[in-house]
Amino acid sequence: MPNNPSLKQDKITGVLYKHPFSVTAFLVLVVLIATGMQLKSGAAACVVQVCGYLLIIGYGIYLKQTKRLTPEALIVLIFAMGFVLRLGYVLYTDIATRQNDAGIFEEGNYNYFHSGYILYIRDHLALPAGDVSKMGEYYHPPFHHIVCAAFLKIYELFLPKGTHNYESLQALSLLWANFSVIVLYKDIKLIGINRESCPIVAALISAAPICTILSGSINNDNLSVLLMFTAIYFGLKWFKEGGIRNIVLSALATGFGMMTKLAVGLIAFSLGFLFIVKLIKDIRGRKEGLRTFLNLVVFGVICAPLGLWFEIRNYLNYKVPVTYVLLSDNIYQDVSRYTPAQRLFGFYGFPIEDYYINLGSDGQQDYNIFITLIKTGLFGEENCRDDFLMSITGYILLLIFLVVIAVAAAGMIYTVLTLKKRDSFWEDISMVIMCVTQIISLTMFAFKYPHICSIHFRFTMMLALCGAVFFARISGIKLKGSNKDLITKITGVIAAAFFILAIIFYTILWTYVKGEVTVVDVTW
């Protein structure tokens, strides 16, 4: 949207634009107090969503009529729609639905899933003792579980004695997911995109299906994503502005992120590149170079102990490898019989016939790494094939997402070819490094652990950042002549279509009732 000096600033959207974190936290707290993060029916949650959408759209029309729909106001409204979407999703999705390795919450049952991990820490105020390689999900670093345990401990002070509401944990999930979207947008802005592309990027990320799925998830993925984006943000700020505060905050976010999920450390490739570039630039000036070097020492001193103490503890006590990952024993998901060529290039009816995940129990397996990544990025592990409405909506959403991916891929090529034309030269290179290292890491992990569950978009959220930046690069292209904004308009339509279809899909998902699941004998 071009800058129009005749537009006036709206006070409400102005406050929301300046204080998104505090407003979001307040709203989540209100929802927690009012609902306990659960409603009696999916229909009630849908009513909340639809009323929220209508209110936001109505307010947007009012701002348009009164000439106060500034680009900033439009972005606020877009993010508000995303908040309402995720709120409704959480209210109709309980902690036993669309979860990954969560297990069942039951008092005194310290199962080897995330639920048992959280309850153990809550009840014992200590970490579980023992060889984590024999304790299921307990191999994960404990920061997320400590936060959840502390939250339950405090929240239960306000409940009648002896009662529990584990659904309340989704208040944290909802908070982390909304914060992640906000920080992701701030990352993209800090890297540098033009003003016209900002609402387009906001539409791409605010209703992103993977963020909606994570908003109801109680495992450690959500918090790790937030801390990863936060580490990138303050790392970028330090690269641009310097300052001990920025490097300390980046180190804390990286350290706590790795203490949530070790894979957060993968950002070291892209951030490390920027840190080295800054050191080389600043070393020309003796004092400035020394200051930058000491800043990096501070980063390492903070980040390394926070991020690695748990893995080192397990190695010293039980010889558990630092990069240990729990192996799946689900034979239905075993795809080791497929060749590397099949796993990279095999296309089996996708996207025409087969656009929901195949986990093997019905005799069909998703063995292609990138097809599985796309499916989980849109639908998680949900399968709505037996519902006509969900199938049609999901299929259209998939087709639009493929267009988004194509534009982002073209944007990466364009970014590389036009690096010297932008002030964000080094930042753009770091995005390319981030994208390449994420894809290589994903591929290596998939080959090392050849199970369908080893591939999920929630493991590759850095691609959301890279993809949005590259999409914005295409959106910002100006043509010559009277149609100079044509590409911006086309990419805007694509982003708007993705935004609308994602909202529709995850607004009506509550209506889906899973049919009888057919489980076949393994034939491979």
Language-model segments: which ranges?
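Membrane-interface transmembrane helices that cradle and orient dolichyl/undecaprenyl
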Residues: 190-192, 231-246, 257
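Membrane-interface anchor segments at the N-terminal boundary of transmembrane helices
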Residues: 28-52, 164-177, 357-439, 464
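Transmembrane-helix motifs of polytopic, lipid-linked glycan transferases
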Residues: 61, 167-192, 230
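Extracytosolic helix-loop segments that constitute the early lumenal/periplasmic catalytic or substrate-binding loops
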Residues: 88-139, 143, 153-156, 337
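Perimembrane helix-loop-helix junctions
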Residues: 60, 64, 239-240, 267-301, ...
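Short acidic/glycine- and proline-prone juxtamembrane loop motifs at membrane-interface regions
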Residues: 210-224
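Membrane-lumen/periplasm interface segments of specific transmembrane helices
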Residues: 293-408, 509-510
